[in-house]
Amino acid sequence: MKRAIVIVVDSLGIGYMEDVIKIRPQDMGANTFKHLLDKVEEIEIPNFEKLGINKILKHPRLSNRDNIGSYGILNLEHYGADSFVGHQEIMGTKPKKPLMEPFSYFREDVIKKLREDGHKVEIPEKDKPYILVDDLVVVADNIETDYGQIYNITAPLDYIPFDKVLDIGEKVRDVVKVNRVIALGGENVSIEEILNSIETREDGLTGVNSPKSGVYNKGYISRHLGYGVNPEKQISTILSKKDYEVGLIGKMQDVIQCENANRTPAVDTEKVMKSVVESMEYMENGIIAATVQETDLAGHGQDVKKYAEKLMIVDKYIGLIMSEMKEEDILFITADHGNDPTIGFSQHTREKTFLLVYG
């Protein structure tokens, strides 16, 4: 191997897992990729077709041309349908089984820990289980994922540096046993806008509606703090310790720990995919791993048209990546879970994923 290129198309599932009938009945019938092809008016993905996607999907809108790569179907190992854990699995580790509890379950322990460490902690609304730390940081449930899996630490970065937000996130991580704590923030947004975007879901989870708050719009930074993740068993750290280069791009650099990695923050799909091509220009030996996040955001927004638009951008760059590959390079394309924009709700769906390999 000279270079391995890993592209994760966030949430591009290919059909519900067999166990959902018992553990997630709301996901019965989910098939993100198929329903995208069923519903969208325009979609052209010739490079996915070349790599064999229709050998898996068998959809009438796609051609049955002979594939130039290898293909397969992957089952999720983790419980639920989560980006963070999905990425850990892709990169080589299996996290410990976390508790699945809402933030209200740990809130008093978190308040005690933060106050002991000198932080100001308030409960702005007594009937809503979120807290405000140091007048600028909201700690609450993540309302974009499964019940009791993730807590968000959200802040306006024009008023507080991200390292302080991360410090608060790490203190919360020390106390709670859920799957993930995410420290995040953006520029050109106020704490008032963040507070005004707090919503309560039908299942009782209360948290910041991140897209509505504006934190994604400018200067977005996040760091995902996992429960029981061992980066020493991930391919990125293993290669780095053997003096291979490691490039992490987009959401991948948010969720994967690797001390010596070159990191490229990006949400915009064009930027993510262009960064992969640019990394290929200077990297001689190593791994480039990138995540396309806007597909997942389109799934949350139940926006079939936007999802297809982002997928076509990915397809365009896959063609360019293949043309730039050298003899010993290898390309992997996969997904981490599903997020069917036609299912009728805005959360992830527990789906199988595809694997396309070229090289």
Question: Where are the predicted features?
Answer:
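Feature captures the catalytic ectodomains and active-site-proximal regions of enzymes
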Residues: M1-G359
